[in-house]
Amino acid sequence: MPTWADLSSSALLPHFKLLWGFHHNPAANEYTGLIAGGHVSEWLGANFWGARLQDIHPPHVVTEARRFFDHILTAPAAGRCSGRLFTMGGKPVTGERIALPLAPDGTHPGGILGATDYAYVPVSGAVELIHENVEWFAI
């Protein structure tokens, strides 16, 4: 399984605006923001880097995100969502999201690299994640 160090910054750079990532601390059972591309930065600003999942989203969203992330790490599997990805200011935003496990030691999953592509909606307001039309791909 790839590690963060295996990722080529030159290969990822053209897609950086789509990327996001979390580190998982199994002892604390916490996910911490690690990579925030342009799209995530637009919603959350500097609040993503180093922030715990529960500090970024409301409790009901955290529960669903944890379920999604936990499956990625424990299966391990790649996850794909399509259709409604989130709401912004109550308006649905559609697109596609993928999330892949990463292993700090090359063997045991402990991080997630994701990419989200969507049609930009010029609205503002609270952002709430949606995991719709989820597909799993065993790794």
Predicted regions: what they are:
Residues 1-47, 51-55, 63-139:
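Intrinsically disordered, low-complexity terminal regulatory regions
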